[in-house]
């Protein structure tokens, strides 16, 4: 008896589906191109030149995912904005150091490739790249039978940016008296989703049908992470920014100290902005303490910027002209023995 001739497809890997995906995403990728990009998709490595305007360029890199927000997106069958989240988590980490994002790569892994779903995801990644001005120059689509449950996939993002060495923002210029400006978030962004999913479970609600402030809860918890790149780069052109903190995992308590010298603290007035309804709902339904809210969520603030008090009003004008919700929320003060570096009152 002759043996059956096996193929890669028999093992669960469909190369034709992968090729179909590449064809489907090409128009989306094309939207993101920059003049520095050399060549197109399909090479073994993606090529990108440095912009010529930099005298002493320093490369800044970052990698991130979207956590269990992806689980919620899969469960609610909404795949078109999770790619924006993926880009946002990477490029926002770059711009806080003054860097302009140059290029982005993605990793998409699944048990069985669904070309329609993957196209939606990559279209979102491309949209995030357009919003941040960086080029989507490559990626990896891994079809791995037996590694994921049916319908599941995972994402990773990788970004490289560039900053003039003399203009790196590292927090070293922060000093007592500096003003703190907050940039409004679009919602929980991409952090705290294991707790969000737990609260939804305990509350016993369906996010697709549960209404909150006139909108489905699903729309509010899956709102794409705000990309601040263009607004922040515009701000840097107009004022002397001393530090920027991207409020991600760890919230206020852990992210703001990352950009502070050891001898100062920040004092924040929590009445200077208002939590969006989704945060109030989460706190109420989950009976979450105030401290835990500020540790897990951004509570309506995506970034905190420290700059000279004399520049605060100008900074607010620049940011609002760029389309941001921005508020003066506090100031930098000397750190006394035994104090925490972040005080919210």
Curated annotation (Swiss-Prot):
SUPFAM superfamilies: PurM C-terminal domain-like, PurM N-terminal domain-like. The keyword Cytoplasm applies. The keyword Lipid metabolism does not apply. One of its GO terms (biological process) is 'de novo' IMP biosynthetic process. Its main location: cytoplasm. It catalyses: 2-formamido-N(1)-(5-O-phospho-beta-D-ribosyl)acetamidine + ATP = 5-amino-1-(5-phospho-beta-D-ribosyl)imidazole + ADP + phosphate + H(+). It is found in: Cytoplasm. PANTHER family: TRIFUNCTIONAL PURINE BIOSYNTHETIC PROTEIN ADENOSINE-3, TRIFUNCTIONAL PURINE BIOSYNTHETIC PROTEIN ADENOSINE-3-RELATED. NCBIfam families: purM. This is Phosphoribosylformylglycinamidine cyclo-ligase. The lineage of its organism: Bacteria, Pseudomonadati, Pseudomonadota, Gammaproteobacteria, Pasteurellales. The gene is purM.
């Amino acid at each position: 008896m002759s043996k059956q001739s096996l193929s890669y497809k028999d093992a669960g890997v469909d190369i034709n589906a992968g090729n179909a995906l590449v064809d489907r995403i090409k128009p989306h990728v094309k939207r993101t191109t920059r003049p520095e990009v050399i060549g197109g998709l399909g090479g073994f490595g993606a090529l990108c030149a440095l912009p010529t305007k930099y005298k002493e360029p320093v490369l800044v890199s970052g990698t991130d995912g979207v956590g269990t927000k992806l689980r919620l997106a899969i469960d609610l069958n909404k795949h078109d904005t999770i790619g924006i989240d993926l880009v946002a988590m990477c490029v926002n980490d770059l711009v806080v150091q003054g860097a302009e994002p140059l290029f982005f790569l993605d990793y998409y892994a699944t048990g069985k490739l669904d070309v329609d779903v993957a196209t939606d995801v990559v279209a979102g990644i491309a949209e995030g790249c357009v919003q941040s001005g960086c080029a989507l120059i490559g990626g990896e689509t891994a079809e791995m039978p037996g590694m994921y449950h049916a319908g599941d996939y995972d994402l990773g993002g990788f970004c490289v940016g560039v900053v003039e060495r003399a203009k790196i923002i590292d927090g070293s210029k922060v000093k007592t008296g500096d003003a703190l400006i907050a940039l409004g978030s679009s919602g929980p962004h991409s952090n705290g989703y294991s707790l969000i999913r737990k609260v939804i479970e305990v509350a016993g609600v369906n996010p697709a049908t549960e209404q909150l402030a006139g909108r489905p809860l699903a729309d509010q918890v899956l709102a794409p992470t705000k990309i601040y790149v263009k607004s922040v780069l515009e701000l840097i052109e107009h004022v002397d920014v001393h530090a920027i903190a991207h409020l991600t995992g760890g919230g206020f308590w852990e992210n703001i100290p990352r950009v502070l010298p050891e001898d100062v603290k920040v004092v924040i007035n929590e009445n200077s902005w208002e939590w969006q309804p989704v945060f109030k709902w989460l706190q109420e339904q989950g009976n979450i303490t105030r401290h835990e809210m500020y540790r897990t969520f951004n509570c309506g603030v995506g970034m905190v910027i420290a700059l000279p008090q004399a520049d605060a009003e100008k900074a607010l004008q620049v940011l609002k002209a760029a389309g941001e919700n921005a508020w003066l929320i506090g100031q930098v003060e000397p750190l006394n023995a035994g104090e925490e570096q972040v005080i919210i009152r």
